[in-house]
Amino acid sequence: MSAGVAVESTALPSAPGLNVYETVAAAIGNTALVRLNAVTEGIEAAVYAKLEFLNPGGSVKDRAARSMIEAAESSGELAPGGTVVEGTSGNTGIGLAMVAASRGYRTIVVVPDKTSAEKVAFLRAHGAEVRVTEGARPTDHPDHVRNIARRIADETPGGWLAGQYDNPANIGAHYASTGPELWQQTGGRITHFVAGIGTGGTISGTGRYLKEVSDGFVTVVGADPLNSTYNGGDGRAYYIESIGHFLHPDSPEDIWPECYDRSVVDSILTVTDREAITTVRALARREGLLVGGSGGAAVAAALRLARTLPADATVVVLIPDSGRAYLSKYFDDDWVARLGFDDRTGDVAVTDLLGDTLDPLTVPSDATVAEALEVLGDRPELPVVLRRTPSSLVVAEIVGSVTRNDLIAANPTSVVTEHLSVPLSVVGAFESLGAAVKRIGADTRTVVVAESGIVSGLLSAGQLTDRSSGERSGR
């Protein structure tokens, strides 16, 4: 270009279909809709997956992040040079950090300790300051994820709390974009919309739009972890991140997000951790789609629903994020085996040593030392778990262990959580004896046996090593 020639704009031409954007935030949305073909064998209805991991930040939460930041800028709550703060399981924080970085804001994100290592790494890569805190805390605890985030926002000059759970801009993002996209992509033929329920923003905003535009014809179905209180579960922990509603037993009440509009959701299908994990692995190996656990839960629910529908039905299931954020979890054979989410092989397995044992003994986290010693009896140690009414015990709710020797010297009226030792080793119920012995290594303490993430029994380390030695010698 010759000198002295005026240039009106250096921006490239932008038009529908060109996918040219001047900012990363502008590239959010308009994600692909892909038909599922292999995992739908025997199903007459069409099942399509909305691939939200194709957003720039890798998840559906990019939509809410952009919407919330833009709303805060418009209202003046977030000013130039400000700090974006949020408590999140990871994806919303990543979206916020991405948009914030592109606009010159600082970001501080508080995440629970069950958040995958990959998500924490993504956050830090975007320049976010990450605070990790224990996830299994009651809602009124000062160090609960959302309470820490609120405190940081209040104490930080220029701090703004995104507050995704109760922020109407969360719902608005999906009413304005996700819903219209699905209606346009399906040519108005969508009959059923399936999505997980986390903050409620995605299913409420998208579902509300689809119901309005279809004059109530579209059915909205929520996919929810079995233990989640959204479907009437007792709130126990589960292993699928980013959906459902966990309730700590010491929380004074079960407060649901304001973004979850229950009137939009026609029904909820519950999904177990095992079903979700099995589904994500099947999607990767049969469909070529690497999706996260919440997407696996949603697809599992969608397939179950689709099997009941006629050939003229069109089911759309929303995939929130990619499996790349969970390679150390759902796609890691060792992680899957340790928690008993795998299938048994022909080898003698750990579960064969349990026999017809009674429910495994545990010490509730609110027990006194005297009460714990009574439960222990002559046992050397036992796991300490969150206090719940009698039911299946999720491995994730083991908060540590106590030893008889430590408690004998302690104040009998003190609480056992003041005397915790590290958690006991966990082995999968379907692991071979050799694999289990290798896993515990030199640990001589009691071993927790897990099946589908649930404690199925306790064994002494000696039981494992002796039987394994016997198997190797042919006894």
Residue spans for each PLM region:
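PLP-dependent amino-acid enzyme catalytic core
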Residues: M1-T351
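Structural motif
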Residues: E86-G87, V110, T133, G196, ...
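Terminal peptide-recognition signature
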Residues: A100, L123, L182, G288, ...
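Bateman (tandem CBS) regulatory domains
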Residues: D261-V264, G346-L361, A367, T413-L424
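The conserved cystathionine-beta-synthase
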Residues: L361-T389, S425-S452, A461-R475
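Short hydrophobic beta-strand segments in globular cytosolic domains
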Residues: L393, I398-V399, V426, A450, ...
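Short hydrophobic beta-strand motif reused across regulatory alpha/beta modules
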Residues: V399-T403, L407, S456-L464
